[in-house]
């Protein structure tokens, strides 16, 4: 009886059908898929456990902990797999057989997956078939919140044009709108589109941060220490649409504080010109100039002298004179920054802390500048020209940046009044 094959059990047969069904999905064999569904051999919403190391199919609640091996695979229906693999024909077959379009076996609907992988064709099909545009994932994100790459901009536009809510906040501890998300990821085109379609420019997340504050903070790529032009464009767009430049987060930081923390003179200039208050203090009692001072030494791509110049020309309070050695500690390799700050005082005397703050190699490298610094900052008064500059600046106060360029003076004198560094102090 060795040649007789044992009959396949019902469970074994179901297992084989499930395997064939999954194989048809993976190979885009929509003909075979259709035949299986017509014969009703398997439920159209059958859930599979598939490899998903990048968690494209999965979404979890914030704060939940799972062992790493659990995160290497996810549960998914045929719809999710068809979207993930870009198999439009299989997607259509499943929808024609009444697959549940908003199913979330592992926290995401097929529409969430389509937006995350930026598959515009699948987004259109799912929307045409009735997918919920504002449905939350298990992590509390809508489909618009999953549009985080330049390639997904068209997906976001499609959703908005079909009625997705551009002001819907995430249902989690962040409470961010799609505008916050686009600002974070530097999608300037999408930010402009959201604003044109009714996004509230001053919407606040759970930390009371506006999209302007988010874009300002993320304008510095911390790993590369480079500034993002896209984030600068976003800030320009938001300010042009009347974003509140002095909005404060839950630490009382304004966007100017965040720009100062990044030592980003482009954004600092943009915000000061838009009416940012240079002397606003945060919860730590720090104004923007203190943040520039704190980070100057760890921002290699920055031009701190411009940051100080901008703030002082917009009326920022000067560094407390007994603490001036901290300016030298932070800027010892950038004499121009020291020059700008020291020229904001009528007179300031050096002390031993100044000398200790300068490494010997920097002292030697910038000897002419440091020699002039110690020579000028002694017991004798500064030049009459410098004192005249201080008198004019004191009279103009926070209008220096506007008033001085309008004076009938030669350009070199205007630059002198605006603290333009010259490389030496006299």
Swiss-Prot record:
Subunit structure as annotated in this protein's UniProt entry: Interacts with HIF1AN. Component of an ECS (Elongin BC-CUL2/5-SOCS-box protein) E3 ubiquitin-protein ligase complex formed of CUL2 or CUL5, Elongin BC (ELOB and ELOC), RBX1 and ASB4. Interacts with IRS4. Interacts with ID2. Interacts with GPS1.
Gene responsible for this protein: Asb4
SOCS box domain: residues covered: 371-423
Function: Probable substrate-recognition component of a SCF-like ECS (Elongin-Cullin-SOCS-box protein) E3 ubiquitin-protein ligase complex which mediates the ubiquitination and subsequent proteasomal degradation of target proteins. Promotes differentiation and maturation of the vascular lineage by an oxygen-dependent mechanism. Regulates IRS4 levels by directing its degradation via ubiquitination and thereby decreases the downstream signal of IRS4.
Site positions for Essential for interaction with HIF1AN: 256
Keywords: ANK repeat, Cytoplasm, Hydroxylation, Repeat, Ubl conjugation pathway
Localization per Swiss-Prot or TrEMBL: Cytoplasm
Placement of ANK repeats on the sequence: 74-103, 106-135, 139-168, 174-203, 207-247, 251-280
Family per record: Belongs to the ankyrin SOCS box (ASB) family.
Species annotation: Mus musculus
InterPro entries, alphabetized: Ankyrin_rpt (IPR002110), Ankyrin_rpt-contain_sf (IPR036770), SOCS_box (IPR001496), SOCS_box-like_dom_sf (IPR036036)
Annotated metabolic or biological route of this protein: Protein modification; protein ubiquitination
GO process terms (BP): intracellular signal transduction; positive regulation of vasculogenesis; protein autoubiquitination
Record-given protein name: Ankyrin repeat and SOCS box protein 4
